C-alpha cells in the first residue's frame, strides 16, 4: 500500500521542483483516494485517468500566481520501522490550522478534519505544509 503512496509523493515533489504542470503517477485505489483528498483541500488543480495508459493517473499540480508550489512540503510521519497511532481524543489535540495531516483509518484515508468530524482515530501518514 505505502510503496505506491511513496512513489506518488516523490513524483509530486520532483514535479514541483521541476515546475511541471502535469505529472503521471500509478492508478491505485489508495492513490486515487489520496488525490481526492488533495483536490478537495485545494492542494492540486485536479487529476484524471490517463487516456494513453489507463493504469496511470495524470496529476495537475497547482502553483500560486508567483509560481510558488501550493504544497511546500510533503513528509511521511508514520514509517514501517516506527508506527504511530492516534486515538480520536488525541486527534482533537492536534492543531490543524498550521499543518494538514492525512490519516489512514479503518474507513480509508481521511483528512484531519474528517477524522475529527467522524470521531475516528488512525495512523497519521502524511503532513502537508
Regions found by a protein language model. Give the residues of each.
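Core subunits and conserved enzymes of cellular information-processing
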Residues: 1-129
